[in-house]
């Protein structure tokens, strides 16, 4: 119900670039993720609360994927059952 959908996946050298469409229950529409092995290099949200999504992206940069999932999974936004951070955790689980 709240799952993200992978829409793009490419590897350039050691860097994996992956894009996900969010579930439609959150303000952001897309999440672009760059990883190097098990480490998140960069996250970019399309749509959503600009300050909050930039904050989440800055906090997870340099973090291991498993740690980010553990910290973000299950965060709820206004009773929606998911949130932009939770959508990122769901996307990271698909990597």
Protein language model regions, located:
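Structured beta-strand/loop patches that form or line metal/cofactor-binding pockets in enzymes
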Residues: 1-37
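Active-site- and interface-proximal helix/loop "cap" or "latch" segments in soluble metabolic
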Residues: 22-95
């Amino acid at each position: 119900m709240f799952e993200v959908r992978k829409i793009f996946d490419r590897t350039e050298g050691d860097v994996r670039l992956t894009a996900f469409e969010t579930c439609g229950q959150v303000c952001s529409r897309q999440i672009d993720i760059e990883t190097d092995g098990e480490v998140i290099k960069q996250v970019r949200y399309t749509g959503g609360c600009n300050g909050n999504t930039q904050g989440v992206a800055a906090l997870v940069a340099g973090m291991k994927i498993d740690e980010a999932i553990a910290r973000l999974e299950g965060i709820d936004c206004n009773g929606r059952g998911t949130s932009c951070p939770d959508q990122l955790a769901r996307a990271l689980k698909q990597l």
